[in-house]
Amino acid sequence: MDVIEIMRDAMSYPLANVKNWLVIALLFLINGILQQLAINYRNAYLTVIVGVISVIVLIVISGVFISIMRETFDNSSEIPMLNPIVNLVDGIKYLITQIIYYLIPTVITLILAFPVTGSKVNQLLMVTSQLAANTTNTTQIVNAIPQSLLIDVFVSIGIVAIFALILYIIFGLLSNIAIARLAETDDITAALNIPYIIKKIQSIGIGKYVYFIVLVFLVSFVFSLVSGLISAIPYVGIIIASFIVQSFAIVFIARATALIYMEG
């Protein structure tokens, strides 16, 4: 199956299972209502309660994402029915996997940041503190800082930022396949087996996988744009966007990711 066929299949998947899709959409409806309540009633206690319930709902939705992929791996064209307990457990596993995959580049970036930017930033702080001892005029302090030092600081920060961006993109690409691996094996350890995930992407075809990601990104951008426009409708916009657009997008992405995974 080529990438375009995968996209067509994933796009038609919710429409071919309208009843089950709408059941899943109820979760998004609940989340949308909670968001609207938080906006309409600015009460600290209500915000906390709504926040906790919303997090639980989002975890269950993540579990639904896993169940859709699992159903796809079984060569089923049906959207699975909700199973709150199973979905909640799967959602927690999903969350743990995602946190770890994005924690790795964060730690690497922080480790790199200290030797690359540490000395320059410390030097800048020392110079600034010395200048501040003589004047409280912010403009004079900024103008007195050597331009070469400012350039060195910005260049070092820029290098770290570019490196971090590349790392996050790489681990983002890995995490998509890792989530599919989690759905396939129901094992977080298997999902964290990065060498296996890399081999899986290679078996899919790096070019094919990147092409797939680009198309999913573009489609998701359109979904976000439509969702944003609908959300601008007073009082009911967020609820409608959550119920229809966001639920459709999640089902689409889950199906598409499972199908590209099966290509490897």
Please place each PLM-identified region on the residue numbering.
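Interfacial aromatic "cap" segments that immediately flank transmembrane helices
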Residues: D2-N31, L82-V107, F154, F171-L225, ...
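Selective recognition of hydrophobic, aromatic-rich stretches within alpha-helical transmembrane segments
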Residues: A44-F73, L150-A191, S227-G264
